[in-house]
C-alpha cells in the first residue's frame, strides 16, 4: 500500500503531467458573407463584387424555409463574418442554431410596412417532409421595393463588417437599387390592378398587395397529380373568380397543365420565387433580378394571350 503522502504526491505529479484543462479555441472567422438562400446571396454578391466572397450553403432542391442544415453547413455559418437571413422566422432552423447574434443579420429589420400573416395548412413537398405555412409570410423579397430594403440592410451591415470595402459596397448597392426600382416600375405598369390569379402556393401575397392583384392561394404540389378534391376546388374558384391564370412555383406536370386548360380554360404560368434556382440556372449566371424579370415577362405574355 502506498502511504497517503506518497499517494497524494503521485496524484499531483500525474495531474501536472496531464497539464491544465484548456479552454475551447475561439472560432477563426473566414472573411466570408453567408446567405441562407439565393435572393440574399444574389443581392450580397451584387453589392460585394469582387471585394468579399459570398456563399450560400443551401443544397440544390432544398426548401430554405424548412431545410435543416447539416453539421458541415452549420460550421460554414459559424465561421462567417456575417450571416444574412431573410428574417420574420422564415428559416425555421435559426431558432435552435448556435450562431453569435452579433454576426446574424435580419434583413427585414428595417421594414416599415406590416408583414402578412397566414393561418396556413400542413402538407408535404419532396424530401423536406410535412410542414406548415401558418404564421408570418416571409416571401417579401418578391416585392421589388421590399427586396430593395433588404439589399440596403445587407450593404449597411457588410460595410460595418468590412469598412475597407464600404465604397465598393455603396457602388454595388446603387446598381442593385436601380435594377429593383426598374422592376417595380415594370410590374406596376405591365400587370393591371385588379388582375385575378390563382396561386398554387402562398408565395405571392406581397406582390398582390403592392400592385393591387387579387390572388387566391392554394397549396398544390407541382410534381404531384391533382386529386379530385383539389380539382373540384380549382373548378369552384374558376367559376367564382374567373381568374386569368394559375401561378406555379415550378413547372407543373404536363397532365396537370393540359387538364386545367382543357377542362377549365385555366392556363398555367411558372412564377419562380427564386428561393433556390436549379444548377442550370446558376450555370447561366441568373441573378435574383434576372429571375424576377423572367417571371414578369412570362406573366405579361400569358395575360396577353388570354
Language-model segments: which ranges?
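Sec-dependent bacterial lipoprotein signal peptides
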Residues: 1-16
Amino acid at each position: 500500500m502506498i502511504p497517503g503522502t506518497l499517494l497524494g504526491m503521485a496524484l499531483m505529479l500525474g495531474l501536472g503531467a496531464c497539464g491544465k484543462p484548456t479552454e475551447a479555441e475561439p472560432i477563426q472567422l473566414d472573411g466570408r458573407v453567408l446567405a441562407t438562400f439565393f435572393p440574399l446571396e444574389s443581392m450580397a454578391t451584387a453589392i460585394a463584387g469582387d471585394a468579399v466572397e459570398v456563399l450560400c450553403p443551401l443544397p440544390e432542391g432544398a426548401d430554405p424555409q424548412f431545410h435543416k442544415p447539416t453539421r458541415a453547413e452549420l460550421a460554414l455559418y459559424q465561421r462567417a463574418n456575417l450571416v444574412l437571413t431573410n428574417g420574420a422566422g422564415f428559416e425555421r432552423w435559426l431558432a435552435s442554431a448556435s450562431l453569435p447574434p452579433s454576426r446574424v443579420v435580419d434583413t427585414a429589420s428595417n421594414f416599415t410596412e406590416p408583414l402578412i400573416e397566414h393561418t396556413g395548412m400542413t402538407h408535404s413537398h419532396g424530401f423536406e417532409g410535412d410542414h406548415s405555412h401558418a404564421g408570418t409570410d416571409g416571401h417579401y423579397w418578391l416585392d421589388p421595393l421590399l427586396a430593395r430594403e433588404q439589399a440596403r440592410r445587407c450593404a449597411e451591415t457588410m460595410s460595418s463588417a468590412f469598412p475597407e470595402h464600404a465604397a465598393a459596397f455603396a457602388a454595388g448597392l446603387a446598381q442593385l437599387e436601380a435594377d429593383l426600382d426598374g422592376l417595380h416600375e415594370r410590374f406596376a405598369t405591365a400587370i393591371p390592378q385588379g388582375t385575378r390569379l390563382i396561386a398554387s402556393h402562398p408565395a405571392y401575397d406581397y406582390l398582390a398587395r403592392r400592385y393591387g392583384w387579387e390572388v387566391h392561394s392554394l397549396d398544390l404540389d407541382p410534381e404531384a397529380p391533382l386529386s379530385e378534391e383539389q380539382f373540384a376546388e380549382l373548378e369552384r374558384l374558376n367559376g367564382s373568380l374567373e381568374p386569368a391564370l394559375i401561378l406555379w412555383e415550378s413547372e407543373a406536370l404536363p397532365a396537370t397543365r393540359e387538364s386545367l386548360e382543357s377542362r377549365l380554360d385555366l392556363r398555367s404560368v411558372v412564377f419562380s420565387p427564386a428561393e433556390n434556382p436549379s444548377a442550370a440556372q446558376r450555370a447561366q449566371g441568373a441573378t435574383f433580378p434576372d429571375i424576377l424579370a423572367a417571371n414578369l415577362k412570362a406573366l405579361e405574355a400569358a395575360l396577353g394571350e388570354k
